[in-house]
């Protein structure tokens, strides 16, 4: 028997206990087989791939930032590829890009805004298209989109679209913008129950009944849709948080009484007079009423979360109802008959106050509003402005059209303030 010890770097079967070796061999072989199968699956088990970004760049696409369903920028996501087309992009270049995009392993966001693309047929093969922006294009026919069930966001702002029947099967759609189109019939939206944001500003829409069964709708914009008079269909949309009815023909918002989660309500330039319904909207943060017929704002007394209020060009004469709305940051009272602003003296969070062309003469109530950054007193009877000397946070003060005294002294006291006089 040799006295040489067995090599530790080249063990042979005699170095291992026989039972252990026999047990280990099947496990090792099995693990190797599993690993091989995984490698083969990754290599050949899927036809999806990453798009050729260099080729896409040569075709006229620029890499952009991915977005959320509401259009806001999303955090970086390796599973998303956002592409923005150069305005000079042609239809043939779009067609040439499709082979690089189809069957992608990433969701695609495509921005063709302000190009001359009219025919959408080449896009039919993009089964991972997540977002499509066609703003300012001559597109009018949407038939190519009817089977794009992965589409979550579609922007048709300033297109020639009038008929949206092709969208009726896109049940995954969460955000749809039809702003400034000739769309008038909304029947295609009846079953799009996943919609969160819908923009119908400056459209020909009149009948809102197709919207009454959209349970997840959070934002609805109807500003400038001048045919809208009846909003009864919105009464069941209890998920609504933001509603724009600016420049519509509505004269009553009684239908909104169940919408207790409302956070932003825009009612500018409407014939509306009665706003009692807002008493039941405790979460309201933004309320815009300029140019409406409102003359009584007592309904606002309990809106403790309100931070932006626009009452310009209304019929109000008293703001006593605002005295406990301490969350207010922006208040516009321009072109009203307001004379007394004592109700504002405890609104310590106020940052912007517009009193343009009001009847306010005494501004002593502003003395303690040290968070004020913008103050507009133009065309008012204000004369004594010494009270403003302590408002060192003021960035802008507008005094033209007044008989304000001691302006030079005020400028010396507020050297960082831009004073328009």
Q: Where in this protein do the model-derived segments appear?
A:
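Concave beta-strand-loop units of leucine-rich repeat
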Residues: 64-70, 78-96, 103-122, 128-144, ...
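Polybasic, lysine/arginine-rich low-complexity segments
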Residues: 14-17, 48-49, 345
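Juxtamembrane low-complexity tails/linkers enriched in Ser/Thr-Pro and polybasic
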Residues: 4-21
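N-terminal Sec-pathway targeting helices
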Residues: 19-35
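Juxtamembrane cytosolic interface motif at the C-terminal end of transmembrane helices
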Residues: 26-27, 39-48
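Ser/Thr/Pro/Gly-rich low-complexity linker/stalk segments immediately outside membranes or between
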Residues: 45-65
